[in-house]
Amino acid sequence: MKIVILGPAHPYRGGLASIMETMAREYQRRGDEVKVYTFSLQYPSLLFPGKSQTVDAPAPHDLHIERVMNTCNPLNWIALGHRLRKEAPDMILMKYWTPFMAPCFGTIARIARKNGKTKVICQIDNVEPHEHHLIDKPFNRYYLGAVDGFVYMSEQVGGELRAYASAPAIFSPHPMFEHFGQRLERSEACSKLGLDASKRYLLFFGLIRDYKGLDILLEAFEKVADDGVRLLVAGEFYNDKEQYRALLERLGNRVVLHDHFIPDAEVASYFSVADALVLPYRTATQSGVTQIAYNFSVPMVVTRVGGLPEIVPDGKVGFVCEPTVEGVRQAIEQLYEEGTLQRFAENFPEERKRFSWGTMCDKLVEVFNQAK
């Protein structure tokens, strides 16, 4: 099959780019012809709260990646749509996570599929964004109405999708992020991160935004009595750091703050020092961070929002709690009850079987075959 993947890829950073590149490799492994078309401009700097959108690492040698898509240039969308219409791949595989992408993606898809051969298939992260705007619904309608089939990764997203599109849609959970490698020896990981190996660490990992509830976790952790446990916060602030200052000052050295983007080469170290990952989210669909934890067999505390309880069954590899200070506090204290972390560790091999890239790519082909 001839496949063009449209979305984030090198040199763009983060989990979305990793997902697209991993799927490209899986389809290449199966013998498909795969090209990846990524952005020449993803976000204008005014709309990007981080420090950099790209990485300095060399491009992967095993993938065909072209930077051809400008989200702010309608003439570019039209030209790329006509290029794809002429190239006539069997499948255009797109990832959708924010309505900001809808005008660009929707225009390209609508033009490309007019050749009567190409089907547009979407792996969809979110329908309704975490931060809402008036343009969200019309933008969603424009893009989602141009897609021939979907794979969604939480039942919440599947339900939201039905309000916009009648095309075939299949559930498949977010696969594990395996490209981060294996767990390191804890002492080695502590040394690499400059951490005191005599302490134990809970991990909050990823971009820091209001809906992720870091303030809930900080308040909950303040109430946890065990002074031998530290909270390791690793990620770049995408909102105002000042709103956390009072909490951070009260907690003092009980919180270790690494407030910068964590490059792929360092991810294994953070998960190798952690007793558990805590996701105190106020809202969620699913989270790619849980799939990093699965890769490293790190137990989790997640809140009962969106698709998180689907990914982390309560009492098997972690705890599901209410998105409140008291709920998170109780779950953290339960983690350190005798035998709990060991029991969770023993359950990981069976739970990990649900999250393969092969299954995800199979589901995308399945919905491609169902699409008209």
Go through each PLM region and give its residues.
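Acidic donor-binding loop of glycosyltransferase active sites
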Residues: 269-285, 298
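Glycosyltransferase donor-sugar binding loop
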Residues: 39-44, 205, 230-243, 260
